């Protein structure tokens, strides 16, 4: 039984280990050399998780939610005369479009249904037709539904057509193996409170050094200037430009150590995959069908279609919370769904307990 009051079956914030929580019981100074050395270690560890070609990449940590880091990239990487192609099939792709529009960046959209992956044929057609496109952005795991998008194919097109590639790997990095050098990803974005299993408070950008250097002077925001943030961390040994979330950084460092102890990203992926497979099998036994086709389904979060007309999600939510579980409502408009996350400090025995509770007739009518 997990020691938390509630087991969060969500895509982040998520259930963390007791040891991750415990390191936040102490106070830390942002100017302390030991703390800044830890920041540098975190940055280096993230690059080593992302690629074998570590010398080509660097990490920028950015205060705030993961969305802050996405906006830092969109607002800093694309020049005034640039044009962004966004692949969208959910809320987080749409959010990138909204950012670009608010920042007055020219944007082209390749949109598919929320339960369908990015259409590679359409993406290539847009690249062929619009020579002004300079950058491509795609969400790896769209947690609106739990679908995985074909970033390998998107990045191949980016390389083929000479575009800068931006991958929002918010809910996949650390839980699904990615080598950003092999894929020729220029900017990868994620967050502390996802598959690394830290707590909310900062996001991070793993950037190709050559591309990051081109961003100098392009920032459209003071606090979200990606280049300036990186330059300060580089020149001042891990110093953040503005107050950093010291407790969150320590928790994240501990979470990185625990990821290594678990056996790395592949071992964590296997646990998440087994959680998700068990969840779908057991939920199927009691009448719940997943929204996303299994060939596109991530191990991160699963959307389930309401089992019958008149099903009340709030009843399910309240009952599960009474049993110590917290799940997510659906986030799409065309199909009634709810979502169950498979990541965090969650194990097969937790999934079995969850479905046992759902199987009790009170929560499904």
UniProtKB/Swiss-Prot annotation:
EC number(s) recorded for this UniProt protein: 2.6.1.37
GO molecular function, one term: 2-aminoethylphosphonate-pyruvate transaminase activity
Enzymatic class: transferase
Ranges in a coiled coil: none
InterPro entries: Aminotrans_V_dom, NH2EtPonate_pyrv_transaminase, PyrdxlP-dep_Trfase, PyrdxlP-dep_Trfase_major, PyrdxlP-dep_Trfase_small, SP_NH2Trfase/AEP_transaminase
Gene3D superfamilies: Aspartate Aminotransferase, domain 1, Type I PLP-dependent aspartate aminotransferase-like (Major domain)
Pfam family, one: Aminotran_5
Reported cofactor(s): pyridoxal 5'-phosphate
Keywords, in A-Z order: Aminotransferase, Pyridoxal phosphate, Pyruvate, Transferase
Keyword Transferase in record: yes
Family: Belongs to the class-V pyridoxal-phosphate-dependent aminotransferase family. PhnW subfamily.
Complex and partners: Homodimer.
Name of the protein described by the UniProt record: 2-aminoethylphosphonate--pyruvate transaminase
């Amino acid at each position: 039984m997990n020691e938390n009051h509630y087991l969060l079956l969500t895509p982040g914030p998520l259930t963390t280990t007791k040891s991750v929580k415990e390191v936040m019981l102490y106070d830390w100074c942002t100017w302390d050399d030991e703390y800044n050395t830890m920041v540098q270690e975190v940055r280096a560890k993230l690059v080593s998780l992302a690629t074998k070609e570590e010398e080509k990449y660097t990490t920028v940590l950015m205060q705030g939610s993961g969305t802050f880091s996405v906006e830092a990239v969109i607002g800093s990487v694309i020049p005034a005369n640039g044009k962004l192609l966004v692949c969208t099939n959910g809320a987080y792709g749409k959010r990138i479009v909204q950012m670009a529009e608010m920042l007055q960046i020219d944007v082209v959209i390749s949109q598919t249904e929320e339960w369908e992956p990015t259409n590679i044929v359409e993406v290539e057609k847009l690249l062929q037709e619009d020579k002004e496109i300079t950058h491509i952005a795609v969400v790896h795991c769209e947690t609106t539904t739990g679908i995985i998008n074909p970033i390998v194919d998107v990045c191949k097109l980016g390389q083929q057509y000479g575009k800068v590639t931006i991958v929002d790997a918010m809910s996949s990095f650390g839980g699904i193996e990615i080598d950003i050098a092999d894929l020729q990803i220029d900017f990868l974005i994620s967050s502390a409170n996802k598959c690394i299993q830290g707590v909310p408070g900062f996001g991070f950008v793993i950037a190709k050094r050559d591309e990051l250097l081109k961003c100098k002077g392009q920032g459209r925001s003071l606090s979200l200037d990606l280049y300036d943030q990186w330059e300060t961390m580089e020149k001042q040994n891990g110093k953040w430009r503005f107050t950093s979330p010291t407790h969150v950084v320590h928790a994240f460092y501990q979470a990185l150590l625990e990821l290594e102890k678990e056996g790395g990203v592949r071992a964590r992926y296997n646990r998440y995959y087994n959680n998700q497979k068990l969840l779908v099998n057991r939920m199927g036994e009691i009448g719940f069908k997943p929204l996303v086709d299994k060939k596109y389904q991530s191990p991160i979060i699963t959307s389930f279609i309401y089992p019958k007309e008149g099903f009340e999600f709030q009843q399910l939510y309240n009952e599960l919370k009474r049993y110590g579980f917290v799940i997510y409502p659906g986030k799409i408009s065309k199909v009634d769904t709810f979502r169950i996350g498979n990541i965090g400090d969650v194990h097969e025995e937790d999934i079995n307990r969850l479905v046992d509770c759902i199987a009790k007739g009170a929560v499904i009518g």
